[in-house]
């Protein structure tokens, strides 16, 4: 396992309780802009984790084919239950394997902030036959979210195991800066949205609640719980409406749909 400054870069290989949940806003935008027109779409989910998003996609569009790309072996194994195919490795390694056929959508769920050169990373897709013409659906953490503004005002900037200050994050984005980046990279913004921030602000508590499940390898314990189902049904819709009033302040993630110009 690689280490940097004394910290393991792969927190799934540590005792850290990594709790995975689906990005419901990202999946909703994928359905609206891709799956409604092409229910049998081929989708590549980069950094698919244990397959939380892929499971949601399969429920909404059973004929869709999701190819997951995931470097972590344990997560990739779990994702095989939800994806049509899983490639264990990085995106660069997957592309080097010369994937066959055309993909209709490219999912980057909290991936871009881990890249050294996000503009170059996005521009590279225009050169790949398999992804040419694919709709890009991506999310990134929102640096302008309300609780981060308070932290910054208090002079606090400590890296953590997850969230906005994840120690593997190399880039930080606001809604405006992400829109500019997509433009510079040659993409036309089709739609944007945000995910509510209340559940994310409870992440430390959720990790403690599901720590035993995660220790047994069940990183989807939260996503599969009755409590999360109730939250999505009863609370998240209200949160979402409030979040849309001021997404730059109240959104935890910025979610965008874009197409190459």
Whereabouts are the PLM-identified features?
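Short, glycine-/aromatic-enriched active-site segment of Class I SAM-dependent methyltransferases
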Residues: 144-169
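Conserved S-adenosyl-L-methionine
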Residues: 187-198
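Short, conserved SAM-binding segment of the class I
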Residues: 120-128, 181
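Helix-to-beta-strand junctions that scaffold the AdoMet/dcAdoMet cofactor pocket
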Residues: 115-116, 129-132
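Short alpha-helix
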Residues: 170-185
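Conserved beta-strand signature within the Rossmann-like core of class I S-adenosyl-L-methionine
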Residues: 132-140
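Conserved N-terminal segment of class I S-adenosyl-L-methionine
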Residues: 1-101, 105, 119-122, 138, ...
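A short SAM/SAH-binding and catalytic strip from SAM-dependent methyltransferases
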Residues: 105-117
